[in-house]
């Protein structure tokens, strides 16, 4: 695997070739990955995989025409041919008045913000095997667990380098580790499954394997013997593990491309109250050891902490250069791209801030409601905000979380749901997107 500086040199060299060959502008992205995965099942080693690969993508512009090509072959002649092919394709492509590199004056010109995202380790597969085994053993030890889908552990490192023809060049490395267990409880038609996992940048931050396994087992057992209940309009409470999916719907609705195409249910919501005034949503690209931390975006713009929702108010769209030009605005440092195609947009370490009440207080006045721990399917209309998803979880009666429920449907409209959300004070930073326990009183629930 290359060092970040070597990866940066490789991207720079490809840009130089493209300019010499006649490109008016160009950008290149180099990505190298190496990963080891170990899977255990019923105490036995089921699978060990080691993967390594590198790829480079080149985007060239000839006037307002552009083309993107990529290669996993780093042979100099292959890359030279790649440049020629890209230029030939660009000359035949239709013009796009919004295409182009990011505005030069917005590029990151200073030393990138230090991102603590790589611990430099490459653990032996035996270490991963032991972690996976401990997680599965702990899950299987929970009373009521009858079978296992396995325990898994993985370790990986990535190098990313980006260069543009108008002055940006940068690279960074990240490491990543994950540990999971998935088990089955019960017998016959009454079987239920569940899982637990942890994903971190530094190996030393990984949750104890025994705790992950225990959580998986207890979650599976807690789902046994689901009950039926009366359908209707009622409060819905989202567990943080599934509540963060609401962040995804929100981000999709404020992306520049969705706004430019007029395909967002928040099309007219800029500078207006979208959530309750007690809530804020913040993107933190420089969080130490954050799962998506980065110092620059996919176009070479600096990243920065951003309050997308400030006391309930929508402050901005998230835009790469093309959609920003279409909207007559400036890109926001949220461009994201791979080796193929033009940049899209994405956020980094996103979270919704804490509320002011405990989880117990959040649900104590609910006479009849549901606590959701699982979501199934993707029945969400991004244009209207209509929301209907399969779900599972637990019944709430008289302020207490009670027996499990399964195969239910929860439905509403995201605009109404967002405005009615109330947050507990139990936020934890476990995923790329994090929320506290959330409650909305604007939904209808159909029982299974």
Regions found by a protein language model. Give the residues of each.
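Active-site bordering "gate/hinge" segments
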Residues: 1-294, 298-301, 310-313, 398-400, ...
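Dual-mode signal for accessory low-complexity, basic/Gly-rich regions
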Residues: 112, 213, 269-448
């Amino acid at each position: 695997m290359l060092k970040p500086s070597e990866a940066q040199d490789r991207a720079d060299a490809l840009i130089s070739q493209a300019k010499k060959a006649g490109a008016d502008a160009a950008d290149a992205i180099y990505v190298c990955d190496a990963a080891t995965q170990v899977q255990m099942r019923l105490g036995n080693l089921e699978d060990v995989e080691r993967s390594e690969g590198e790829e480079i993508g080149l985007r060239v512009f000839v006037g307002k025409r552009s083309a993107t090509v990529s290669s996993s072959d780093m042979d100099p002649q292959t890359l030279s041919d790649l440049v020629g092919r890209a230029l030939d394709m660009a000359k035949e492509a239709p013009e796009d008045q919004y295409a182009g590199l990011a505005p030069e004056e917005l590029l990151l010109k200073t030393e990138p913000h230090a991102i603590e995202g790589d611990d430099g380790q490459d653990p032996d597969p035996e270490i991963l095997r032991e972690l996976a085994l401990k997680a599965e053993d702990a899950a299987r030890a929970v009373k009521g667990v009858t079978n296992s889908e396995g325990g898994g552990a993985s370790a990986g490192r990535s190098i990313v380098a980006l260069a543009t023809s108008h002055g940006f060049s940068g690279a960074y490395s990240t490491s990543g580790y994950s540990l999971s267990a998935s088990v089955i409880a019960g017998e016959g038609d009454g079987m239920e499954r569940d899982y637990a996992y942890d994903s971190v940048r530094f190996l030393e931050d990984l949750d104890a394997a025994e705790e992950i396994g225990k959580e998986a087992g207890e979650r599976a057992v807690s789902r046994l013997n689901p009950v039926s209940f009366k359908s209707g309009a009622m409060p819905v409470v989202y567990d943080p593990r599934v509540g963060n999916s609401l962040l995804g719907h929100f981000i999709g609705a404020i992306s520049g491309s969705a706004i430019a195409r007029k395909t967002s249910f928040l099309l007219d919501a800029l500078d207006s109250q979208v959530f309750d005034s007690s809530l804020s949503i913040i993107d933190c690209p420089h969080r130490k050891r954050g799962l998506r931390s980065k110092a620059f975006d996919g176009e070479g713009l600096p990243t920065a902490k951003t309050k997308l929702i400030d006391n309930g108010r929508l402050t901005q769209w998230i835009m790469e250069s093309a959609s920003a030009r279409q909207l007559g605005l400036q890109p926001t440092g949220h461009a994201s791209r791979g080796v193929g195609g033009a940049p899209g947009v994405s956020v980094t370490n996103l979270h919704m801030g804490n509320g002011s009440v405990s989880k117990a207080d959040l649900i104590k006045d609910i006479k009849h409601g549901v606590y959701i721990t699982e979501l199934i399917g993707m029945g969400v209309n991004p244009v209207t905000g209509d929301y209907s998803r399969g779900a599972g979880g637990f019944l709430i009666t008289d302020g207490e979380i009670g027996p499990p429920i399964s195969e239910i449907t929860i439905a509403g409209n995201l605009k109404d749901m967002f405005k009615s959300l109330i947050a507990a004070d139990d936020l934890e930073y476990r995923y790329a997107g994090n929320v506290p326990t959330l409650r909305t009183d604007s939904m209808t629930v159909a029982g299974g």
